[in-house]
Swiss-Prot record:
Species of provenance: Shigella sonnei (strain Ss046)
Homology family: Belongs to the cytidylate kinase family. Type 1 subfamily.
UniProt GO BP: nucleobase-containing small molecule interconversion; pyrimidine nucleotide metabolic process
Keywords recorded for this protein, A-Z: ATP-binding, Cytoplasm, Kinase, Nucleotide-binding, Transferase
Protein name as it appears in the record: Cytidylate kinase
EC nos: 2.7.4.25
Keyword Kinase included in the entry's annotation: yes
Entry's Gene Ontology molecular function annotations: ATP binding; CMP kinase activity; dCMP kinase activity
Record: residues binding ATP: 12-20
GN (gene name): cmk
Major localization class: cytoplasm
Cellular component annotations (GO), alphabetically ordered: cytosol
Compartments in which it is found: Cytoplasm
Superkingdom in the source lineage: Bacteria
Length: 227
């Protein structure tokens, strides 16, 4: 009988620290990593590379079904590998973002990408970063964590990130955008942003990233009986 690879799902709102936590856990456990938030951008970029019409659901479905993508975390840096090429920077362009919002609107594309995401489940295990990993994509995952933080703290973190890149930021506007996105994500009809009933809700508002990583790893190892 083939062993089923364990999955640790990390869900939560934007700015809670999911990406940093997932990279740290994947490196600590030497497990595979899935950044579900990047999947639609990767598909959009693949479509642009292969001259596939991003407005054609029929053309996109086979591309989504066989998307050749890997996520590799090295020293805290995430590399997105599409067809053997590092596209970490390329998927962040506005052209790709616009195309990603188009491809994400197609139900059959979303279904194909759901199956593709589940295919990341390989031994020794998978860390899945997203918003509906524990509720929709891997409902049977043995370890589910919902990482949260206050909207004010998430806005503050985002402001610091943008300021470090040289951008001028209005905190109140940033906070309003985050609250609006939270409201939209939590109240949408399909896969709303809610903790799975069996998830550990971890509030990172007053914790350092090191404390968050320590708590999450301790919980995961306890649930999985890992040394």
């Amino acid at each position: 009988m083939t062993a089923i690879a364990p999955v640790i799902t990390i869900d939560g709102p934007s700015g809670a620290g999911k990406g940093t936590l997932c990279k740290a856990m994947a490196e600590a456990l030497q497990w595979h990593l899935l950044d579900s938030g990047a999947i639609y951008r990767v598909l959009a970029l693949a479509a642009l590379h292969h001259h596939v019409d991003v407005a054609s659901e029929d053309a996109l479905v086979p591309l989504a079904s066989h998307l050749d993508v890997r996520f590799v975390s090295t020293n805290g840096n995430l590399e997105v590998i599409l067809e053997g090429e590092d596209v970490s920077g390329e998927i962040r362009t506005q052209e790709v973002a616009n195309a990603a919002s188009q491809v994400a609107a197609f139900p059959r594309v979303r279904e194909a990408l759901l199956r593709r995401q589940r295919a990341f489940r390989e031994l020794p295990g998978l860390i899945a970063d997203g918003r509906d990993m524990g509720t929709v994509v891997f409902p049977d995952a043995p370890v589910k964590i919902f990482l949260d933080a206050s909207s004010e703290e998430r806005a503050h973190r985002r402001m610091l990130q943008l300021q470090e890149k040289g951008f001028s930021v209005n905190f109140e506007r940033l906070l309003a955008e985050i609250k609006e996105r939270d409201d939209r994500d939590r109240n949408r009809a399909v896969a709303p942003l809610v903790p799975a009933s069996d998830a550990l809700v971890l509030d990172s508002t007053t914790l350092s990233i090191e404390q968050v990583i320590e708590k999450a790893l301790q919980y995961a190892r306890q649930k999985l009986a890992l040394a």
